[in-house]
């Protein structure tokens, strides 16, 4: 075993309150593309850049085009949890992991069995009518065409995800800050730490060990006590 992975395993074994903070790289091994990696959504060619399409302005002005892109490129109903999701759920069941803070919207942490999941950017599994507030599952979006319409009032149904130009949920952000501040081991995985305010959360960590697991270097590597440049699922599969 890689000595860095072995060291991480030792720290996990000794930790009383682990918090995991993850991004798109956590789900790439489940077949969901990362926005920023080579081959990710930002490097694929569209009429508009993906960050424009998944913006509040684009959603309001071109909802048909938004949903065409959203269904094709943002929804992966066949995706299943990988080794990283499963290991985190296992640690939570053992009482070692306090929370998962995620930038992902795919719901794979919950599918693996995690309960305390703070979804900074919302979830594709929650959708609601903008007029009457009625809730709808992911299947409703997948089975509809064009702009999904509420079966109760006819209003537009939108996903409960944070689009560009929209603010994060303040309650979820506050809970994430509290969990990170109370952690003795913070593991950051599968994120390039460039999207704010989410990336700024690590400054609240005051615990013993900060670990970064990411395929490529991040701006926070120098702050970490341990850095592992590898796929997170491959790393977590080797942990106790």
Q: Where do the language-model regions lie?
A:
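Conserved catalytic core of sirtuin-type NAD+-dependent deacylases
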Residues: 1-240
